[in-house]
Amino acid sequence: MYDRLQAVEDRYDELNELLSDPDVVSDPKRLRDLSKEQSGITATVETYREYKNVNEQIDETRELLGEKLDDEMREMAKEEFAELQKEKAELEERLKLLLVPKDPNDDKNVILEIRGAAGGDEAALFAGDLFRMYSKYAESRGWKVEIMDANPTGIGGYKEIIAMMNGNDAFSRMKYENGAHRVQRVPETESGGRIHTSTATVAILPEAEEVEIELHDKDIRTDTFASTGAGGQSVNTTMSAVRLTHIPTGIVVSMQDERSQLKNKDKAMKVLRARVYDKFEREAREEYDANRKSAVGTGDRSERIRTYNYPQNRVTDHRIGLTIQKLDQIMEGKLDEIIDALILEDQTSKLEHLNDAN
């Protein structure tokens, strides 16, 4: 572990020199990339330096204890030695976590896709509830939410809604929401008071930059059509809606939220790029992790990850067996308790895997 930490510190010092190099300063992209790399290892380097400093103090205190001391000084030195040993152990645990490989997508913005699944109108209403929940969570963290496309139902729900979330740590926290979300409640239209079960699926995609995934014009078929509203009626007579098909993968994205065809195409391209990037990344990750299943779950969008039980005011995350009797607060966007628990479980699993590999 310590060889790796020393290598990280050496790289940090090298980056310091590079960031003051005139050739780097005059190249905005390289400057941005190197600054981002340095920022990503700063916490590790600072903790490692603190750890080395504590080690030096331990050595000095050990030498002091080997000298001739009066009883009071010896007792003080022993207490200091015990405190330093405790601090060293805590720093070692922090360093182990800091060495866990970071998801390269963690700093990216998010494309959020929610679809009503099993349950008809009630599933569409639940999809709308989930979108409002995520919107409030985003607001609490200072993220910006922009609806990119939506297919609303006439009763206040969504068959599908796609939105962009821009903000610090957006993907690192939202990525755990991937999967099928189940709701158990009495629908407003249910006269007999029976509890119905419905589901909505959530997909969390990292926004892909053009430099990360190159889409060639020859691989994209563009179709235009008139925008339609709820119920299928045409809402304008111009061909402003856009459908993009990525021929090699068969991925299709339609966008009709804007009145401008150009704006719809731009939004559709962002979603298409994210979906193609996600497909390639998932395939690579599945191949790499073929023999390892994460404790947090596979992240498969068909996997039921969470149940929202309204009569019992209960939310259960099935991946980690966490049950919280605060559904009313969760639906108001207070998601940190669940997400923090998922992050901790994920880090613990990765740390165990790292220890096994070593």
Swiss-Prot record:
Keyword field: Cytoplasm, Methylation, Protein biosynthesis
Pfam families hit by this protein: PCRF (PF03462), RF-1 (PF00472)
Cell compartment(s), UniProt: Cytoplasm
Modified residues (N5-methylglutamine): Q233
InterPro entries given in the database record: PCRF (IPR005139), Pep_chain_release_fac_I (IPR000352), Pep_chain_release_fac_I_sf (IPR045853), Prokaryotic/Mito_RF (IPR050057), RF-1 (IPR004373)
Transmembrane segments: none
Post-translational modification: Methylated by PrmC. Methylation increases the termination efficiency of RF1.
Role description: Peptide chain release factor 1 directs the termination of translation in response to the peptide chain termination codons UAG and UAA.
Protein name (Swiss-Prot/TrEMBL): Peptide chain release factor 1
Organism: Listeria welshimeri serovar 6b (strain ATCC 35897 / DSM 20650 / CCUG 15529 / CIP 8149 / NCTC 11857 / SLCC 5334 / V8)
